[in-house]
């Protein structure tokens, strides 16, 4: 058990993954963003967005040849229907824009349309920057 350790520096352990973190504020709410980006171009991305240290939803979205729009599924659902719906629709839009399979955990406690728009814009801006590297 002594050799067991928790680290936030995964990149030093595995050079095939890059972790990007971002904190932003919407009015009085602090919003945390974390991106796990694998170095292989065919690999999915994992995005965690939350206003608290929780992991209550997880959806996956991907483009498949027989469907016109990306298919989405909940892997972990919260009690909040709004959070589940936001996670699904946002992960679909990420797949459409960036053409990459997406795992998204979206745990925002408030259902404010302006905040949702702010979060989506922030994610898209950050992904545009991170996926170019």
From Swiss-Prot:
Ranges that cross the membrane: none
Pfam families tied to this protein: PAC4 (PF16093)
GO biological process: proteasome assembly
Keyword annotations from UniProtKB, A to Z: Chaperone
Role according to the record: Chaperone protein which promotes assembly of the 20S proteasome.
Similarity remark: Belongs to the PSMG4 family.
Name assigned to this protein: Proteasome assembly chaperone 4
Encoding gene, per UniProt annotation: psmG4
